[in-house]
């Protein structure tokens, strides 16, 4: 379905939960947050129904996010439900990786096609610092398990934070050189715990790329499967590729093809737009598929031309990334 800016909206991101087993400093306070109750979030069956309705409007790709999606029970069951919807041709998951290895084979059997790992440091002490409680060895195990199961493309998302992990950029490049991994460097954004956010910690994607090109030859390539916002480059002599995501310095809104569904049923056209359509209430009130479809149409038509994060969005928006879906 086309929005009013002639963008083809064919991708929906679904937050399964606002809970997480980590406490990343730029995302969530150390003490955690007041999590949603079981009764306030969508059931797996409700999520599957909404995916089916959305597919009738042209949604083809689904990504499951959180919080940490794998802290929710029965994720393979949800994936199995979604995989049976005829118009859905791609199911992906974004995870911190700490719980993935034990579930990997079950997830793939259920119908999971692709996986993205959020990983900001390869140094155990720094990883523990940024996550406040994570075990890096579990994430590494998960990444290689995904490769073993041929869940290609396997992507690693690194949020580059100047003064914290910018000295590890080359280490992440080496992962893409040695293994068939697609490493994406993401600009630091004000979308979580604003006490950790400082504008001078944001390293522009063009600076990251220029730094890498001092040591490596990069060649532009077609976008990797996933219809995401990254600009991809092959790495001379490398097994994988590099991607650069620049929401702060060079937004990609003109190509945005996604809508977002929160765990409690809020449908929004943009991560940075505070307007939401409450689908949970519609489901509770017994709305028909056609009535719910009209709510999807409204949300898609209301999708803004671009975000305004550089104009102080972070200070105004009370909803954090773990609540909306990363």
Swiss-Prot record:
Q: Give me the residues that bind [4Fe-4S] cluster 2, please.
A: 253, 256, 270
Q: Looking at its record, which EC class is this enzyme?
A: lyase
Record text on cofactor binding: Binds 2 [4Fe-4S] clusters. Binds 1 [4Fe-4S] cluster coordinated with 3 cysteines and an exchangeable S-adenosyl-L-methionine and 1 [4Fe-4S] cluster coordinated with 3 cysteines and the GTP-derived substrate.
Any GO BP: Mo-molybdopterin cofactor biosynthetic process
Return the SUPFAM superfamilies for the record.
Answer: Radical SAM enzymes
Extract the CDD domains matched here: Radical_SAM (cd01335), Twitch_MoaA (cd21117)
- Biological pathway: Cofactor biosynthesis; molybdopterin biosynthesis
The positions annotated for binding [4Fe-4S] cluster 1 are 20, 24, 27
Q: Which domain of life is it from?
A: Bacteria
Give GO terms: molecular function aspect only.
4 iron, 4 sulfur cluster binding; cyclic pyranopterin monophosphate synthase activity; GTP 3',8'-cyclase activity; GTP binding; metal ion binding; S-adenosyl-L-methionine binding
Reactions the enzyme catalyzes: GTP + AH2 + S-adenosyl-L-methionine = (8S)-3',8-cyclo-7,8-dihydroguanosine 5'-triphosphate + 5'-deoxyadenosine + L-methionine + A + H(+)
Q: Name one Pfam family in it.
A: Radical_SAM
Q: Where is GTP annotated to bind? A: 13, 63, 94, 155, 258-260
Q: Which UniProt keywords apply?
A: 4Fe-4S, GTP-binding, Iron, Iron-sulfur, Lyase, Metal-binding, Molybdenum cofactor biosynthesis, Nucleotide-binding, S-adenosyl-L-methionine
Q: Which cofactor does it need?
A: [4Fe-4S] cluster
Which EC numbers characterise this protein's activity in its record? 4.1.99.22
Q: Known SMART domains for this protein? A: Elp3
Q: Which annotated residues bind S-adenosyl-L-methionine?
A: 26, 67, 118, 189
Q: Which residues form the Radical SAM core domain?
A: 4-227
Q: Which Gene3D superfamilies match?
A: Aldolase class I
- Report the coiled-coil segments: none
Family, according to the entry, reads as follows: Belongs to the radical SAM superfamily. MoaA family.
On subunit structure and binding partners, the annotation says:
Monomer and homodimer.
What is this protein's function per UniProt? Catalyzes the cyclization of GTP to (8S)-3',8-cyclo-7,8-dihydroguanosine 5'-triphosphate.
**Protein name as annotated:** GTP 3',8-cyclase
